[in-house]
Amino acid sequence: IQRWDAIRYLFLYRFGGMYVDFDYESIRSIEPLIKGKTCCFSEEPETHKGGFGREVDRYFNNGMMLCVPNHPFMGKIIEAVFSDKGDLYDMHRFDYVLRTTGPWKLMNLYYDSKESERKDIYLIPKQYVTPFDYNQSRRFILEKERSEELENCLKDAYAIHYFFSNWRKEIK
């Protein structure tokens, strides 16, 4: 997964465009959300904040990313990923991935950046692109639940991230 993370960062930096995980469902065009933006990441629900080890206002991931070619923040990500020695992390392999190439790496870079640099990075609000947390997505997909709670989550949604995380199976 770390190689794939690095490849998508390189591709987005060089060519620009949009990357979306396979476990996303598009409900409607996100064009109104991203119009005029140069770098975007999808925000995650608060219930996913556990383990990051840092108090932050907004938690986001690399499951949906958009940027123009040569965006400075994407360049910063690439530099950090390829300069990381990796031998500093004595932790579970899942956490290691999150910290070296995944969301925790991105969030540390984002929150360590100057506020003036962060203004150019749009964190797409969770109600638009990640209306469900992990447990809600399981109830919606696997149990086919159609409760008022879940339906209310979808009222403003442009996309749904189901958080299948198939890559976790590979890192046992």
State where each predicted segment sits.
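Glycosyltransferase-associated regions of secretory-pathway enzymes
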Residues: 1-5, 20-172
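Small-residue hinge/turn detector
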Residues: 5-17
